[in-house]
Amino acid sequence: MKKYLLVVQIFISLNVWAQQTRWQLSNSTSIRWNAEEGLPYSDHIEMSGKFISAVVRYSVNADQSLIVQRDLVWPMLRTIPNNTHASLIRSFTIDVVKMISVNKRLIQKEFVKGITLNGKLIVESTLNDNLRLVRTLFPSTDLPLFGEEYELTNTGTKEITVEIPNVSILSNTKAGDGVEGSYAIAIKTYNAGAVTIQPQESIKFYLSFSGTKEGQDFSSVVMADELNKRNGLLSQLSQNLILETPDEILNRMFAFAKIRAAESIFQTKGGPMHGPGGLSYYAAIWANDQAEYINPFFPFLGYHYGIESALNAYQHFARFMNDEYNPIPSSIIAEGVDIWNGAGDRGDAAMIAYGAARFALSQGDRKIGEELWPLIQWCLEFNKRKLNQFGVVASDSDELEGRFPSGKANLCTSSLYYDALCSSEYLGKALGKDPQLLLEYKKRAAELKKSIENYFGATIMGFNTYRYYEGNDKLRAWICIPLTVNIFDRKQGTIDALFSPDLWTNDGLASQSGDKTFWDRSTLYALRGVFTAGDTKRGLLYLRHYSNRRLLGEHVPYPVEAFPEGNQRHLSAESGLYCRIFTEGLFGLRPTGLNSFTLTPQLPAEWDFMMLKKVHGFQQEFDLTVLRKGSNIQLTVKSGASIVFNKVIRNGSTQTITFRN
């Protein structure tokens, strides 16, 4: 019966996919929507720089007119009370196009023809038969400024005179509302004035929105340079950690996810802090989003600012180590000056140890490894002290912070602690730590693996899988997490449960069977775990479904946080989790030393190749190539001109790769 239901679910999903593609792949870096189809339509996207983040809400009405609302966040313009959500936020709906005169007459109508996304929001319109407009909306990379470029092109045979308004609007916030007093918010046009556009020629003008503290002035900024800097960042990200597979949708979704994963880092007075975003979470770090989800990914991307932010996050958490082994706070907020621990101990020490050990190994820097070792040790000892009588880790809650029940001990925390013990054994060996201590970590991991099976292993709703906590009798999305840490005792029943109609929805996994709530993070973990466990057939099927919906569906182009909470915000760390489906799932990359790792490539049956180019890590840049060779695969690891590994192996077998430094 379960197999029958799975076949029905797959059939339904295939039909749904065919109905949900609004967007199309465009050139090698973008997606495009033809705005003459499927009207009206509206969506929102978040874009970020070091000093600003923007949630842009755009709508195209039935008559092809455009409405744009920019919800702008200045994370370092702190408001009172200076809590998690205290970034200065303002919304703007100004439409400068409606202020333009063409041949002495105001524009009567704008017709949107298409919208392109490529790390920028580009809107193509016509203003009359002979005047084309291309808007490009983007955040500044390193200023507290949001920019818009307007390019007007005369497509006719006669010259056109346009008058572009000189907009200069300044407002000041109430001094008593700001941590540093009053803040100035400015809206300004550049290249304004009357200009004649000859046939087949173009002119450009710009609009900016800035937020500043006293003494700051960006009125003389060159907006074309700001756009070039944004393009430079996007180019840098596109040229590192490049995924190539026969499935262009997966390749493109991976490329987009790199953008969102990397752009949301804010230069706070407490150092660079990767922030989730979503109009709520900035200039702060969390043990799950940063320490666990995104930080272990940054070494492979080779994005130095991301690596700097990861190290900074662990350094901040290390400030809260204590001799009494009281919990490290879940979040360090307000540029590092305050904390949040409103959900108690969420298993945060397990999250931190898991991420810090993987990050230190992958970065391959002995100095960083030594610096993070005391934090990792402290977190491991904290978890050891939290073991209950059944040998699993007790905690007050989990990363969902009470939104769903998690009991007194949950599956996530113990699984993360298990992986942290495994990684710490590798790291300790690389750093030359006490062999007896490392033997103890290995012993603890083996005992914990047994305890996870004995305590959490259960038949839930007919599936041979896991209960999430004692007393849990409904399937939960997080039953996937043992698969991601190479615990495969119940992989068949767990994968069957994940892809059953009890859990799988058109938006991925429901948080709990029978509930409409979904959080992408658990779906992203699940897809990684399914590939890690070797079920490439179902893994690829559902990965395609998910990627097609997120990249080309109604709400694009990134993974999201959740629904209904937050209305599918483009939180940043989820994009890092998407990329980890490939690095750790399909390619099975697991760091085992400062210059070594294992690969367990899982080439899907319908693919003849898959590649990751310009992978960073272990103080190297290298390429991974997997080619089908009959019933086997050929795995090649190349670093520069050197072939590090080149063998024909069994698909799904594990190989050890060592760089000779």
Predicted ranges, named:
Residues 1-20:
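Bacterial Sec-dependent N-terminal signal peptides
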Residues 18-252, 302, 535-539, 547, ...:
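Terminal accessory carbohydrate-recognition/targeting modules of carbohydrate-active enzymes
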Residues 109-119, 239-279, 483-484, 493-499:
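Conserved oxyanion/phosphate-binding beta-strand-loop segments in alpha/beta enzyme cores
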Residues 134-137, 186-194, 330-346, 358-359, ...:
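Aromatic/His-enriched, Gly/Pro-containing loop or helix-boundary segments
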Residues 196-223, 279-283, 329-351, 381-446, ...:
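The feature captures the catalytic groove of carbohydrate-active enzymes
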Residues 255-267, 315-323, 352, 381-389, ...:
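Glycine-rich, acidic and aromatic/proline-enriched surface loops and short helix-turn segments
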Residues 265-268, 321-326, 384-394, 454-461, ...:
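Proline-centered turn/helix-capping motifs that create local helix->coil transitions or kinks
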Residues 286-311, 315, 370, 374-377, ...:
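Active-site core of glycosidic bond-cleaving carbohydrate-active enzymes
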